[in-house]
């Protein structure tokens, strides 16, 4: 506020720079660039003296820690060693401005580090330490003075939070500054862009915009230089700053959706092929079972026929024996012969009757298939109780990079304990809706909304992160305050009520998340 009072009476006359060339199509993800812009600031210099105050100029910068700003050394050179020059930092959102002082100054590679006062808590940007390829799509974010002049902004407006200006282009590699390592690119810059970040399509910092080329007629041309990571990382390390780094390839949500659709189609084709294979295998197994059953039945019928014939032959022998005994007057022998005859005839009849019928072939084949099916079905657990199924599952969830888009978050394994009813880690109750179990997390200390999903059947855990502006974040916090969150392990009705209540927050979210992290969960060891 002191800075605003110092410069409000002043009018800053800015030169209107000629606009050269047409804008390239914005191929970067607007959501990621907007999210990164939350940590981009305007850096202003004001001199105070006996004759009053005057604004010396302004540039851009970006946060690498909540209270640490990177900018160009030439932006703050007038304040270096001069106690009469005040540095002010104005963020792109909110209503506050912050005093700053130089903590590291390196004119050799045009870098400076500022520390903010007044308990500043800006959104740090993430740096990309990987290789920058030729033709790579990029975005420059900052506060070009020609835009301020075209809008008619006065000095008071300059110390009021304003939206950043974003321009887009591509890397033109192969040429670097002789003084220090730089990235040559075509994203339009103007006076005032100095110190702002050069971003990739995921909103990660590739370099610090520094200067542009000048054509023969003195006008800005369409090639510009940004200080590369080879200069920035050692500079920050020497200053004791550990920035957040992310080196995964930059993929879009649309790319993930296409890959998921293709993967789903492949899975459906695989499932269909497996179903056909199982059907063919079952038909083959049934044919074999029927063939085996047919052989068994025919064999048993032949054995029964042979046994009946053998018994009939024996019965003829018994009849002959009984006849001879009667001719000889042997009553007892006759009775024995007749008894044997009766037994053998009955045995032959039973042997014939007990032969399996041909219709038994199909029945036996079905019985054999039932045995095969039963042997392929896993047995239930020993206790077989529902209590065992409802016991908490301790899982460890590992990121699947091929199905994830990670731009600014750290990659770590996630321990997760899931209980039936939607209780996570014994303290967080998930809501139940048509899309399954989920929880919307709206923190107070970070302008990020996370929507987490868990599929108990597939053991799949998904986190979608939305990097929000301060106004949208405040609206989401207001909606969160209206929700009565049930205790962990609540009834299904309460879980469904929570799922419905969270929908009010989801309506405030952008169409696509900035990050989508898919995890595969396995039992923890």
Task: Please name every model-derived segment.
Residues 40, 65-87, 91-150, 179-182, ...:
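Conserved active-site neighborhood of the chymotrypsin/trypsin-like protease fold
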Residues 75-79, 123-131, 136-181, 190, ...:
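Flexible, gly/ser-rich surface segments that form the specificity/activation loops bordering the active-site cleft
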Residues 284-371:
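C-terminal single-pass membrane-anchor helix
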């Amino acid at each position: 506020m002191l800075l605003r009072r110092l410069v409000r009476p002043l009018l800053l006359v800015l030169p209107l720079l000629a606009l050269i060339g047409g804008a390239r199509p914005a191929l970067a993800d607007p959501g990621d660039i907007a999210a990164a812009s939350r940590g981009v600031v305007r850096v202003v210099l004001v001199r105070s003296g006996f004759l009053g105050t005057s604004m010396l100029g302004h540039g851009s910068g970006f946060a690498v820690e909540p209270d640490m700003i990177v900018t160009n050394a030439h932006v703050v050179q007038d304040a270096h060693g001069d106690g009469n020059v005040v540095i002010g930092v104005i963020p792109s959102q909110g209503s506050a401005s912050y005093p700053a002082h130089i903590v590291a100054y390196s004119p050799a590679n045009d870098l400076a580090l500022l520390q903010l006062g007044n308990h500043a808590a800006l959104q740090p940007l993430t740096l990309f330490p990987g290789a920058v390829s030729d033709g790579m799509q990029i975005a420059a974010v900052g506060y070009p003075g020609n835009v301020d002049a075209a809008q008619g902004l006065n000095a008071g407006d300059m110390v009021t939070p304003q939206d950043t200006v974003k321009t887009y282009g591509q890397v033109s590699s192969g040429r670097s500054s002789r003084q220090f390592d730089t990235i040559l690119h075509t994203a339009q810059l103007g006076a005032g862009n100095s110190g702002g970040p050069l971003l990739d399509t995921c909103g990660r910092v590739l370099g610090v915009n520094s200067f542009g080329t000048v054509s023969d007629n003195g006008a800005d041309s369409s090639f510009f230089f940004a200080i590369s990571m080879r200069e920035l990382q050692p500079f920050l390390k020497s200053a004791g700053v550990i920035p957040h780094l992310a080196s995964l390839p930059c993929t879009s949500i649309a790319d993930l959706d296409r890959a998921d659709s293709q993967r789903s189609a492949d899975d459906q084709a695989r499932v269909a092929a497996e179903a056909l294979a199982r059907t063919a295998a079952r038909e083959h197994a049934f044919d074999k079972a029927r063939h085996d059953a047919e052989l068994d039945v025919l064999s048993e019928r032949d054995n029964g026929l042979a046994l009946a014939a053998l018994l009939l032959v024996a019965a003829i022998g018994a009849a002959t024996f009984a006849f001879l005994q009667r001719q000889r007057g042997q009553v007892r022998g006759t009775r024995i012969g007749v008894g044997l005859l009766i037994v053998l005839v009955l045995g032959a009849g039973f042997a014939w009757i007990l032969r399996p019928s041909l219709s038994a072939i199909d029945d036996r084949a079905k019985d054999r298939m039932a045995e095969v099916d039963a042997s392929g079905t896993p047995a239930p657990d020993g206790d077989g109780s529902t209590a065992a199924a409802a016991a908490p599952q301790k899982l460890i969830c590992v990121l699947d990079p091929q199905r994830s888009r990670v731009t600014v978050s750290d990659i770590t394994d996630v321990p997760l304990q899931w209980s039936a009813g939607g209780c996570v880690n014994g303290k967080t109750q998930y809501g139940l809706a048509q899309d399954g179990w989920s929880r919307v997390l709206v923190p107070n200390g970070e302008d990020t909304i996370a929507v987490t999903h868990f599929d108990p059947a597939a053991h799949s855990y998904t986190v979608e992160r939305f990097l929000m502006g301060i106004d949208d974040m405040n609206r989401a916090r207001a909606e969160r305050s209206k929700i009565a969150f049930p205790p962990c392990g609540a009834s299904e009705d309460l879980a469904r009520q929570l799922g419905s209540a969270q929908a009010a927050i989801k309506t405030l979210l952008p169409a696509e998340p900035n990050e989508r992290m898919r995890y595969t969960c396995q039992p923890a060891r």
